[in-house]
């Protein structure tokens, strides 16, 4: 029997542990459900297919042209119908650099799409962590308000008893009733905020809104302060910066692509023709073949080439400027993220100390009121101070947890908790 009880206890503990959801598990489920990541992955696949399509420009092409005609007037000795079928195989030898530019552009587009997909993973991961910590904060805030309501109710019982015994005036009873009404209103708001946070939590991972949630991690857990990352390493790790750098290279290739149509073009091919003899007197057909070379040399287009290439170079310059702007943005983002992280860590320590003091003050005030040496106003003021500092602590812990997640997103580093 003892073994059976131990087995049941172990099973219950196992089921309870399995029901809890860790931050890593939630982040994984959000990424698996994310429509944004699915779209980015589809865009990467599209870009990969475009690379294969661009490379077909190096290969010969096979095409055929056909026609059929029927004359309305009858010519003596000549049949009224006629047809022609002309297959051709053409190999482009030189397209002015257009084919190589198209392949290079497609390859860079594929790399850019992969970078965009990686950057979207950072954003989705941060959104998951932000939502997780928000729900944790709303849980703690709801618990603190419930505790606050319990404290006021216990004080109300004491006040009502002392009023019934004639030790205090009616004003004290009215004050505690008013404070209880305010606390119940705060409880209603806290429950609403928790419900909204839970709905957002479930929507982000694609489950039913009524699904109950039990978090295995909390903002009150000890989250280590991450080490600051060297800025050069931050830039080297950012997928969006890599994409912007690739965009500069793509713009350089686009200059060559813009120039290509104005360069000489050379292609060779072999073709055939199946058609009736001309004139078509007997309806008999013949098959003939030919080898050919096609050359196109643009000569004068009123400065069109110069303007097209100049416009492409301006777009290249814009890409370079955008890269420099992104560099400054990442620098600002990293500096502000680190300052916010350090400040929020200090705020957690300060708020924890203040909350301990407020808790001791509440105990002393309640004890003094029970002994008749303090007024109910002193107790109510201590309760308000305790709730405010408790809320400040929750806010500070939430801000710190979010700041850690944000800094890891900024530096493109995986979460370590």
Explain the meaning of each model-derived region:
Residues 19-63, 92, 169, 209-252, ...:
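Bacterial Sec-pathway N-terminal export signals of envelope proteins
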Residues 1-24:
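Bacterial Sec-dependent N-terminal signal peptides
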Residues 39-54, 120, 124-143, 161, ...:
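Amphipathic alpha-helical coiled-coil segments
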Residues 38, 61-80, 92-121, 242, ...:
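Small/polar (Gly/Ser/Thr/Ala-rich) solvent-exposed segments
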Residues 83-89, 289-295:
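Hydrophobic, lipid-facing positions within transmembrane beta-strands of outer-membrane proteins
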Residues 107, 170-179, 310, 376-384:
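Short, charged, amphipathic alpha-helical segments
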Residues 120-235, 337-340, 344, 386, ...:
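Periplasmic alpha-helical coiled-coil/stalk elements that build and connect Gram-negative outer-membrane
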């Amino acid at each position: 029997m003892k073994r059976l009880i131990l087995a049941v206890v172990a099973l219950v503990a196992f089921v309870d542990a399995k029901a809890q959801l860790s931050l890593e598990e939630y982040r994984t489920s959000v990424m698996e459900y994310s429509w944004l990541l699915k779209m980015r992955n589809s865009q990467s696949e599209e870009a990969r297919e475009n690379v294969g399509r661009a490379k077909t420009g190096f290969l010969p092409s096979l095409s055929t042209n056909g026609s059929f005609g029927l004359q309305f007037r009858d010519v003596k000795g000549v049949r009224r119908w006629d047809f022609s079928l002309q297959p051709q195989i053409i190999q482009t030898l030189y397209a002015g650099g257009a084919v190589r530019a198209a392949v290079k552009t497609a390859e860079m587009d594929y790399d850019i799409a992969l970078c965009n997909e990686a950057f979207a993973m950072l954003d989705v991961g941060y959104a998951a962590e932000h939502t997780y910590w928000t729900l944790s904060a709303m849980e703690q805030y709801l618990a603190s308000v419930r505790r606050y309501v319990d404290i006021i109710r216990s004080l109300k019982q004491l006040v009502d008893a002392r009023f019934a015994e004639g030790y205090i005036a009616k004003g004290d009873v009215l004050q505690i009733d008013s404070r209880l009404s305010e606390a119940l209103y705060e409880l209603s708001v806290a429950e609403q905020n928790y419900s909204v946070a839970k709905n957002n939590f479930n929507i982000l991972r694609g489950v039913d809104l009524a699904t109950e949630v039990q978090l295995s991690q909390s903002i009150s857990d000890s989250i280590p302060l991450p080490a600051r990352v060297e800025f050069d390493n931050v830039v080297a790790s950012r997928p969006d910066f890599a994409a912007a750098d690739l965009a500069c290279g793509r713009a350089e290739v686009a200059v060559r692509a813009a120039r290509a149509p104005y360069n000489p073009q050379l292609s060779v091919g072999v073709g055939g023709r199946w058609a009736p003899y001309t004139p078509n007197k007997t309806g008999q057909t013949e098959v003939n073949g030919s080898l050919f070379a096609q050359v196109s040399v643009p000569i004068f287009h009123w400065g069109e080439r110069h303007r097209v290439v100049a416009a492409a170079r301006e777009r290249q310059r814009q890409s370079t400027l955008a890269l420099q702007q992104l560099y400054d943005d990442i620098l600002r983002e990293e500096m502000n993220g680190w300052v916010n992280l350090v400040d929020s860590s200090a705020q957690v320590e300060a708020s924890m100390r203040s909350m301990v003091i407020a808790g001791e003050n509440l105990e002393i005030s309640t004890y003094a009121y029970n002994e008749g040496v303090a007024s109910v106003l002193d107790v109510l003021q201590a309760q308000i101070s305790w709730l405010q500092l408790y809320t400040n602590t929750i806010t500070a812990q939430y801000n710190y947890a979010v700041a850690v997640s944000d800094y890891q997103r900024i530096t493109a580093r995986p979460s370590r908790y």
